[in-house]
Design a protein with these regions (language model features):
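Active-site microenvironments that recognize anionic phosphate/pyrophosphate groups
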Residues: 1-130, 136-173
Length: 173
């Protein structure tokens, strides 16, 4: 496939003329399927998980970024689980897979920034309820990430540490 074409539509990079921030428009992204729980492709026997598993990843079938730079990470084969319910061992398996895939994607010459995040609920655009996250490998450093990096560099340490309660401070909620 040539250029930014994918089986799910054309990817178009745009720049906001007011802020200079880059974004990607995917023409057919809104045509992703909304599946009922009974037909979950992430459950064992489903399209993306033919066998039981503990944790797994695969290329996103509806990629928001072109060139194999979007992956889905399934946290568990249990449809009703959450990341918090995985326990230490399950969470460790997920984090290890995040690290492994981030390293692989980050080593690509066309990748400048790797973002790992969790998808949960329709409010954030998740079309499947099964516990999962995604990994995006950008060909540029997004503006917010660049700003955060600059702030870390200015402080020489985590700038949030100055706002965290110390061991002798009372935490107010």
């Amino acid at each position: 496939m040539a250029g930014n074409e994918s089986p799910r539509g054309t990817h178009s990079a745009r720049v906001d003329p007011l802020t200079g921030e880059r974004t990607t428009i995917v023409s057919r992204r809104q045509s992703r399927p909304n599946l009922p729980d009974g037909d979950c492709p992430f459950c064992p026997g489903g399209l993306e998980a033919p066998e039981p598993y503990e944790v797994r990843w695969f290329a996103n079938r509806w990629p928001p970024l072109p060139g194999g730079r979007a992956e889905v990470v399934l946290y568990t084969d249990r449809h009703d689980a959450t990341f918090a319910s995985l326990g230490v061992g399950g969470a460790r398996r997920v984090v290890d897979l995040w690290a492994e895939r981030s390293e692989v994607l980050g080593a690509r010459p066309d990748v400048d920034y790797v973002l790992v995040f969790e998808n949960r609920g329709p409010a954030v655009g998740a079309t499947i309820a099964h516990p999962h996250g995604q990994i995006y490998a950008y060909d540029h450093v997004p503006a917010r990430a660049a700003t955060e990096y600059d702030r870390f560099s200015e402080h020489g340490e985590d700038p949030l540490d100055a706002h965290a309660p110390g061991p002798d401070l009372e935490r107010l909620v």
